[in-house]
């Protein structure tokens, strides 16, 4: 409680001191104004007296000081306003320069697009002109066609093997293929003398025979193999 009371007293003292200082300031201002008025009146009387020299009063000096302060404040405010105006002008100039760059970029893009369109149109025109020239060229006459047909007819006659190859190159139906593969034929090897059963294009089949027939086939095959080897080696006269 004692601490609280001391705090309240200190606060009240500080408040009373502040009020006293404010009152003193007001009194000093009033005194200065009175002194200034008295000095001005005395200066006027002295100026009216002959041979008196005019001395500057303290009020005049204070007023001149106040005027100088006001001038400095006005000059500082004018300088701040000029700086703000210069910054605004610089920002406006930068914005105008950026707008000018954007406009130039757009103009350049438009020019490029126009050039591309012109090139495409030129290419299309050239292609059309070339196609028309090709169509306008005269084709082969009837005489030339007859001559070429006669030359083809006068060529060599195709053999059976060539015809069979040409037929083999043609596409076959499933029925034709099945019929061709179902054919079984005996083929004799001229060098060895062996006979084989071949189905279709080249499938080799095994023939079921008796033992005696198998022996005869082996004898013929060995004889044929020997003769073929001797012919290749040049042993036969």
Curated annotation (Swiss-Prot):
List all Low complexity biased stretches: 74-98
Write down which residues bear the modification named Phosphoserine.
55, 148, 182
Tissue expr: Isoforms 3 and 7 were identified in brain, pancreas, prostate, and testis, but little or no message could be detected in other tissues.
**Location of region: Disordered:** 1-161
Family annotation (InterPro entries): Nucl_RNA-splicing_assoc_SR-25 (IPR019532)
Q: Where is the composition biased (Polar residues)?
A: 34-45
- Gene Ontology CC annotation, any one: nucleolus
- Induction text: In case of Herpes simplex virus (HSVI)-binding to cells.
- Looking at the record's lineage, which domain of life comes first? Eukaryota
Query: In which broad location class does this protein mainly occur, judging by the first location in its UniProt entry?
Result: nucleus
GO term, biological process aspect, one: RNA splicing
Which GO molecular function annotations are given, in alphabetical order? RNA binding
Any Pfam family the entry gives: SR-25
Compositionally biased spans, kind Basic residues: 1-29, 101-126
Protein's cellular compartments: Nucleus, Nucleolus; Nucleus speckle
Protein family according to the UniProt entry: Belongs to the ARL6IP4 family.
Subunit structure of this chain's protein: Interacts with ARL6. Interacts with ZCCHC17. Interacts with SRSF2.
Q: What role does this protein play?
A: Involved in modulating alternative pre-mRNA splicing with either 5' distal site activation or preferential use of 3' proximal site. In case of infection by Herpes simplex virus (HSVI), may act as a splicing inhibitor of HSVI pre-mRNA.
Question: What is the name of this protein?
Answer: ADP-ribosylation factor-like protein 6-interacting protein 4
Taxonomic lineage of the native organism: Eukaryota, Metazoa, Chordata, Craniata, Vertebrata
Its gene? ARL6IP4
